[in-house]
Amino acid sequence: MAEETQHNKLAAAKKKLKEYWQKNSPRVPAGANRNRKTNGSIPQTATSGGCQPPGDSATGFHREGPTSSATLKDLESPCQERAVVLDSRSVEISQLKNTIKSLKQQKKQVEHQLEEEKKANIKKQKAKRVLEVQIQTLNIQKEELNTDLYHMKRSLRYFEEKSKDLAVRLQHSLQRKGELESVLSDVMATQKKKANQLSSPSKAGTEWKLEQSMREEALLKVQLTQLKESFQQLQLERHEYAEHLKGERARWQQRMRKMSQEICTLKKEKQQDMRRVEKLERSLSKLKNQMAEPLPPEPPAVPSEVELQHLRKELERVAGALQAQVKNNQRISLLNRGQEERIREQEERLRKQEERIQEQHKSLQQLAKPQSVFEEPNNENKSALQLEQQVKELQEKLGEEHLEAASQQNQQLTAQLSLMALPGEGHGGEHLDSEGEEAPQPMPSVPEDLESREAMSSFMDHLEEKADLSELVKKKELCFIHHWRERCHQKTHHLLSEPGGRAKDAALGGGHHQAGAQGGDEGEAAGAAADGIAAYSNYNNGHRKFLAAAHNPADEPGPGAPAPQELGAADKHGDLCEVSLTSSAQGEAREDPLLDKPTAQPIVQDHQEHPGLGSNCCVPFFCWAWLPRRRR
């Protein structure tokens, strides 16, 4: 359409030029024009007024000869001038045609460049849409990652709580293991002492005691198998948790790699867009330079100003469109820069999230290391008081005839305990090594990244739970001590208020076999009662020592525990014939810096589960000074 309008305009301009030339050119006679178009022959019959009638040719010729030559000369000079003017005008017309052709070519080039720019703009818009879609996908992936992180944190908290419970159980089992080892060593010593003091008991009683000890051994074996099975289950759960963490980590790394690849492709596309923009800017600068170049000077006689003005307007319009395109390209470049900044911010956020996740894995590994140390002995804690009570009963009841059988049983118990300790330690070490190689490092009790609200709230909840647990432990310890004191007072009151004074005399003289005339059976019963009183008094004394050592970690004796000198003096006077079964365990508990809290909870649980363990009597400390006076 544009070319047709241009052709129409050129045809109209040519018509106007012809009309203008016809109006301004002087009129020439038709005969002169015809004679001019011939081969240069001068007509003889041409006159100023037209053709004359044929008359006397000779007279007419000779009569009008000088006038016709003058008129011919006068006519030839303007004709020549007009011919020159026509030649110059034809040259100018050819020049104008050439300029019009060059302008048409420039216009075609400009239109071609505009079409290319439109295509480039369309491509840029498509790329922009693709970038927006990719940004939306990145945001969706970011939200998915956040949800995955939240679920991982919840699972980590759940496993942390489990590991804390396991650590507490392991700590109690370690304590009871040391106590049992010390108890076994004390049992051997006390059995040797009692071999010299005790008389031979009846065969029926010894057989019954042996059967009871065998039953207790069977129960202990069953408990050992249960403990081993529970330990294996804990190891399997731990390995499964480590594998789960590995899978989560690998999946998260794959997502990060995909996102990094997408970011690289976006950067490449952006570089390509920038190159295209630079090319367009160069082409625009070239076009501006071409437009700024001065056109060739127009001849003054060419009347094509309307067409030139129209062409100038079209060029101005094209220049305005190009400037608008340049502005649009600049705006697109600004938008691309903003998108680049957003992408960089997203990369920084993702990097920070990755660092936080790595720190959490490291802290989890650091927390798993101390938990594996306390993992083994936790399972032995339940049967600790049972073993101690069983050893005490064996100490009181076994006689001289079955000392060898009792020593063999004690050796079997020690072998079982050593077997429990050795595979537990071996498995624990291997488990620690395998965790150090495989499992991701766990979170410490105090999180390092306290900037996030979730970490801060979880840390505060952890501290509150810890404080509540410590308060509960203290309350249970106080209740346990109060209960044991009341029970000891009741038992001693019952023994002292027994009619006939048999219990008092038996308690006083049973240890040294001073029963008198009442017979050997009463003396033996009284000696057993006295031994039970002394053993339980030592147990209470050792338990108070243990509580004092737990509350005073600086190896200072507690206010309720007696001094070592007093204990030694009491042993010299013969008050306490029995050795405390828990003194060495208490010393180990004092020396061990990991045992910050007493084992009140398992003791209370065992006492509630087995109420018959504490059926024997206990003598308080104020009765110790009374016993030697009665013996004297």
From Swiss-Prot:
GO CC annotations on file: cis-Golgi network; Golgi cis cisterna; Golgi cisterna membrane
Region (Disordered): 1-77, 352-383, 423-445, 496-524, 550-569
Swiss-Prot/TrEMBL GO biological process terms: Golgi organization
Golgi-targeting domain as annotated region, ranges: 529-632
Top-rank taxon: Eukaryota
Biased composition (Basic and acidic residues): 352-362
Membrane topology: Peripheral membrane protein
Ranges of biased composition (kind: Gly residues): 508-520
Sequence ranges of Low complexity compositional bias: 555-568
Biased composition (Polar residues): 38-50
Coiled coil: 86-154, 209-421
Keyword entries, A-Z: Coiled coil, Golgi apparatus, Membrane
Compartments (UniProt record): Golgi apparatus, Golgi stack membrane
Similarity comment: family membership: Belongs to the GOLGA8 family.
Protein purpose: May be involved in maintaining Golgi structure.
Protein name per Swiss-Prot or TrEMBL: Putative golgin subfamily A member 8I
